Regions:
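Intrinsically disordered, low-complexity Ser/Thr/Pro/Gly-rich regulatory segments
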Residues: 1-173
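Short amphipathic alpha-helical segments
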Residues: 4-5, 71, 232, 236, ...
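Amphipathic alpha-helical segments that form well-ordered structural scaffolds
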Residues: 8, 12, 239, 243, ...
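Solvent-exposed functional surfaces
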Residues: 37, 312-416
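Short, flexible loop/turn elements at secondary-structure junctions
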Residues: 44, 55, 259-261, 299-302, ...
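"Short basic amphipathic alpha-helical interaction patches in structured regions
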Residues: 64-70, 270-272, 308-314, 347
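N-terminal leader or domain-start segments enriched in small/polar residues
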Residues: 95-98, 102, 107-111, 115-293, ...
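A sequence-level detector for short glycine-anchored, His/Arg-bearing signature motifs
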Residues: 286-313
Length: 416
């Protein structure tokens, strides 16, 4: 069990492009009068991730965390001193640690990976680490297996690492960049969306979308009940990738996305255009910030991530990633719209798109119902059942995660 747990976590970091420091795992040392060890260290550029594994049963995790709290606090209180200590203590580690960066530019994160669920109060008592609970472990294993190095942006987001602080080849870029695309803006009278919604269409290269995109997947790590998108499928990604290599052409159907609030449709003078004053479609410039996790994909995640980067990058795909352009329809929300209203809008749109292809599965409809009609009988039943499965008498009996086997499906029970 322990070996399998470590293997799954290691594969996620390796697939994302992190390098494992090989000669320090499980070796005892004393730092600041505290005897301890580190289970694993992974590095990407100036980001250093210290990983602590445990396969203790739920009842024993609290004690394990309590024993680790002191060393976690000491490391996070002075990460520069700790990294200097490691370089002096373990010969050969200097070459594996981030080179070319000032010590103050190095970012240290401690990740605590428990194989079993445990009480949330222990996390509150030991707030230092990033907690990669087992569902998150399996989630990143699946995502990184499907999209390899292109999973790195989401993993860094999970680690609460600001991407602007992450270096490249020993350098950290201070200025912010953006990509400008030619597109068209639909008048509000022609879209029939509510007032203030802007609909723009433009062509964007897959590389830019891969750097900027995120997907709110139902089985992901984000702490929200209002998630409904399916897990990414490696088989589907590989199928589209094979098509791209064989046909050398893009899919012509739209990628549907939400754009960050600072995006504005601009005219030739780079002035913001008011779509409410338009009587016909207008040519515009769309300036997208080159910022990870800023463009939300509502429909088309497999078509975008089929261009993903790998360790030994496929030369054909690498070329198509920058040469080809995907047709993108972007939605810019009104400034005053709340997060709840945005989630409802996206859920309704997602259901409309997917229910026209085939009959949407009851599981999908129920997940979207939680967003659109939270007080409907099915939504209440689904939430109650989920809570009972998480920490009640139905724990281990009802399916909670995409990787659960030999369990009853929530959608079947709720429908019944």
């Amino acid at each position: 069990l322990q070996a399998d747990h470590r293997s799954v976590v290691r594969s996620s970091f390796r697939n994302a492009g992190f390098a494992r420091v090989s000669n320090i795992s499980d070796r005892q040392f004393t730092f600041d009068n505290q005897a301890t060890d580190i289970d694993d260290i992974f590095i990407f550029e100036n980001v250093i991730v210290l990983i602590e594994y445990t396969c203790a049963q739920s009842s024993g995790v609290g004690e394990h965390l309590k024993n680790k709290k002191h060393i976690f606090d000491k490391i996070l209180a002075d990460p520069v001193q700790f990294l200097t200590f490691l370089e002096n203590r373990f010969s050969g580690i200097t070459e594996q640690l981030a080179t070319g960066y000032h010590p103050q530019q190095k970012i240290v994160r401690i990740v605590y990976c428990s194989r079993h669920d445990f009480d949330e109060k222990y996390k509150a008592n030991v707030p230092g680490p990033v907690y990669m609970d087992y569902p998150a472990v399996r989630y990143f294993a699946a995502v990184s297996d499907a999209v390899r190095r292109s999973s790195r942006h989401e993993l860094l987001h999970f680690l609460n690492v600001d991407n602007t602080a992450v270096g490249s080849a020993g350098k950290i870029t201070v200025s912010t960049s953006s990509n400008e695309y030619s597109g068209s803006l639909l008048p509000e009278a022609h879209s029939h969306f509510d007032n203030g919604f802007k609909i723009v269409t433009f062509y964007a290269d897959p590389e830019a979308l891969l750097r900027s995109a995120y997907v709110l997947r139902k089985d992901g790590w984000r702490d929200s009940l209002n998630l409904y998108q399916r897990m990414i499928s490696r088989a589907k990604v590989e199928g589209i990738r094979a098509y791209l290599k064989k046909q050398k052409r893009v899919f012509i159907n739209n990628i549907i996305v939400t754009l960050p609030p600072d995006v504005r449709p601009l005219n030739s003078k780079h002035e913001t255009i008011d779509s409410s004053t338009l009587t016909q479609t207008a040519a515009v410039k769309i300036k997208l910030p080159d910022r990870p996790n800023s463009i939300g994909i509502i429909d088309g995640q497999h078509r975008v991530f089929a261009y993903h980067e790998t360790a030994d990058d496929d030369s054909e795909i690498a070329l198509l990633r920058v040469q080809q352009n995907l047709l993108v329809t972007g939605i810019i929300y009104p400034q005053h719209l709340s997060n709840i209203e945005r989630e409802k809008f996206e859920a309704r749109l997602f259901l409309e798109i997917n229910s026209t292809q085939t009959n949407a599965k009851s599981q999908l409809k129920q997940a979207i119902g939680l967003v659109l009609e939270p007080f409907a009988s099915e939504s209440i039943a689904a939430r109650v059942l989920s809570q009972l499965a998480r920490s009640g008498p139905l724990q281990g009996v009802v399916e909670q995660h995409f990787f659960d086997t030999n369990t009853l499906k929530t959608s079947s029970i709720v429908s019944f």
